[in-house]
Amino acid sequence: MDSLDIFINNINRLAIAHNLNTYRKIANFLNVTEDSLKHWQSKTRCPSLKRLDQISDKIGCWSYALIQKDGDIFAEIELLRNNSRKILIKNLKEYFLQEGRFSWNDKAALFYGFVSEDALKSYFRKENFKTPPLKKLDEMASALGKPTYELIKEVELNEKTDTRKNKE
């Protein structure tokens, strides 16, 4: 199941939980246009990371939860703003370091042609950067052997390293 399907399922879960039974009500609740919602439902478009962050901020959950199967979208966390792009860049940098990939060519090679070197560079620019849509994130995650939501999930220090001495 790709992240757009999961996103749509989670939006439907929200709609049911909040008794939102029309596109207009759901769109108003999420602060998006009805057209956007219909395009997502029909899979002719997918939300950007920025839009994912805006929706998550509106409903009070982590952005990654919206693209995680049965994600905790009802968590009602208190945070200033989600920033999936920043987390994506941080996670990719860490992955590149772990894999010993230092040149742009080596980094792009990890994605088996799904992401060009130029596109990858554009994601990392400080200004006038681009962010990958969900479909591209799915391809990137697939190439790295990870679920898509993990690319935009901030990993806590204790999750990065297992400090238990006995894993039994």
Over which residues does each language-model region extend?
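Recognition helix of helix-turn-helix/homeodomain-like DNA-binding domains
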Residues: 31-47, 113-131
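The alpha-helix within a helix-turn-helix
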Residues: 27, 56, 108-110, 141
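A short, Lys/Arg-rich alpha-helix, primarily the initiator
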Residues: 1-20, 73-106, 110
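DNA major-groove recognition helix of helix-turn-helix/homeodomain DNA-binding modules
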Residues: 50-65, 133-150
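Central "turn" residue of the DNA-binding helix-turn-helix
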Residues: 31, 60, 102, 113-114, ...
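DNA major-groove recognition helix of helix-turn-helix
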Residues: 15, 41, 51, 59, ...
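Helix-turn-helix DNA-binding elements, focusing on the entry/boundary residues of the two helices
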Residues: 22-23, 49-52, 104-105, 137
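Short C-terminal boundary/hinge segments that cap the last helix of small helical domains
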Residues: 60-79, 145-162
